[in-house]
Curated annotation (Swiss-Prot):
This is Ribosomal RNA small subunit methyltransferase H. One of its GO terms (cellular component) is cytoplasm. The keyword S-adenosyl-L-methionine applies. Specifically methylates the N4 position of cytidine in position 1402 (C1402) of 16S rRNA. The lineage of its organism: Bacteria, Pseudomonadati, Pseudomonadota, Alphaproteobacteria, Hyphomicrobiales. It comes from Methylobacterium radiotolerans (strain ATCC 27329 / DSM 1819 / JCM 2831 / NBRC 15690 / NCIMB 10815 / 0-1).
Amino acid sequence: MSRRRPAPESSPRHDGADAPPEPHVPVLLAEVVEALGTEGGTAVDGTFGAGGYTRALLAADPALQVVAIDRDPTAIAGGQALVAESGGRLRLLPGRFGDLDGLLAEAGIAQVDRVVLDIGVSSMQLDAPERGFSFRSDGPLDMRMACDGPSAADLVNEADETVLADIIYHFGEERRSRAVARTILEARRRGRIETTAQLAELVAGVVRTEPGSHIHPATRTFQGLRIAVNDELGELVRALHAAERVLRPGGRLAVVTFHSLEDRIVKQFFAARSGRSAQGSRHLPGGPVETVRSFRPVTKGPVLPGEAETARNPRARSAKLRAAERTESDVPEPLAALTALASLPDAARGHRR
């Protein structure tokens, strides 16, 4: 698998907020198929979307059965044509990929041979103004992948200033999060903030564009709110542990991420589960903890898109693929440190402006 030096990371997944509308193009497609292998059995596409990875897996291995999961009802409806084309080799399950082991159990499937996860928001969601993910086109401030639960508008109009600042700082990595939160509170005293254009304009008034940058000043704020609304990092942590439980020995897990928060979680999960990170300390009661190696690496570090792919699809430029193979070890306890990475810290202080 080819690797290259990473381009500077500039935005959330697929970077669709400030790029012209494009059809959804699966990223690192050949590399994902190669990492997963093609030897029959059952594969799970935990983030079906437009079906790019599912379609490629079905084409690469005529003996493969695929179970695809998505919490977005639009994606499930759009995938019915592919189900019909698959000749009984594809099943679509509505639900969250963090619950993939439970969804598979309900479908009568105990173990699988491959799992692929493509993390974050899809191009289809970004490019639909009515979904409220993007500031490129005005629309309702929604951002919900599953179309239920509190929306971004609910969060923006009801959360207190500290919570908003912490979300924007930790999930959006926006250094001006306090100023953004303060501006939001001042604006909502005059009336509810209901649209993406309203919010983008408010943020642009306090976040300066760096010289030479093409990144919209609201990019990081929108990322932070979207991650919070959909609990994206928590879903990722649950999905990694769920995949660990359902993969047979020799089964493979491939994960594509699009920003540093996601990649950090995947990297630490694979490092811990393959024995490449400390599991204990001689300074703690009981001393070092014996490592249970439930995975062995398939990729050596992240696999990155090449220049040809990023030229065809600029939204791929921040993508990273990591993959590992399940060993015969029993499933260890979930990693509490990953849950902490996916959550707002109890005290987030000192660095926001």
